[in-house]
Amino acid sequence: MRRLFLFLALLFAAMPAAAQYAPFNPVADYVTPGQDEPGYRYWVGAAPYRPLYVRAFNDYLVNNGVGGVAPTWQLLRTASDWQKCGHQPFEVPPTFAWPNIVAALRFVGAFIEPVVGQVEPVSVYRNPALNVCAGGAKTSTHLTAGAIDMVPLRPITRDALMLALCRIQLDKGSWNNIGLGFYKGLRFHIDSKKAREWGTAGPRGGYGCPAVLTENGIPYRAPIQIAPPILVQPAATLDPLAPRR
């Protein structure tokens, strides 16, 4: 045992200082300068109509009980390839699409965040031209703001995240018309279009959430049908970055 401790101490000492103390920051892999908080402040102040649009969107989320699920400014992030495509880093979705993001946020706030902790959206609405440039599907739910790509802010491994989200998806997502998808790393996708999944695989290579559970030794159970509650947020949870009246 003493030799093991000595080996670990030597291994830690040999690591670069940056690796020893690097904070857990999964957002850094998907958010470039200009799509961060300083970038949002610059963007929202660059046109006189933008604060009005953001305020209306923020008020709609609050009035529909999802104003505290994620900061409003993060829900305005477009695509990670915004700069390469020559588009805006943020965009307020068209009003016809607002109910779609409410449905997705309600599921995230009711079922996902209580399990994996706070999440940060990294891509939500994409206009048609940006969606094409970014390689999105022709029928992508991002076109109607019903999809949210996000990462967890609490330290977790990809396998543990996939297991947690697959349990939620099989228990509650399938009959709530929620789609679940996984990208590389910790980035995952939730949408309110229809029940489906992609990018999920068990540790032995089996496809889909049932394989994720069974290959981790967790038997699949029939879902308990519990509708997501309406999340009523107090006024104190108004987004601090949303423009004030």
Language-model features: locations:
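Sec-dependent signal peptide hydrophobic core
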Residues: 5-9
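Catalytic cores and adjacent binding grooves of peptidoglycan-active enzymes
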Residues: 20-31, 139-148, 152-245
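Positively charged n-region of N-terminal signal peptides that target proteins for export
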Residues: 1-3
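N-terminal module-boundary/linker segments of secreted carbohydrate-active enzymes
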Residues: 20-48
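Cell-envelope/glycan interface and biosynthesis
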Residues: 42-194
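N-terminal signal peptide c-region/cleavage motif recognized by signal peptidases
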Residues: 14-16
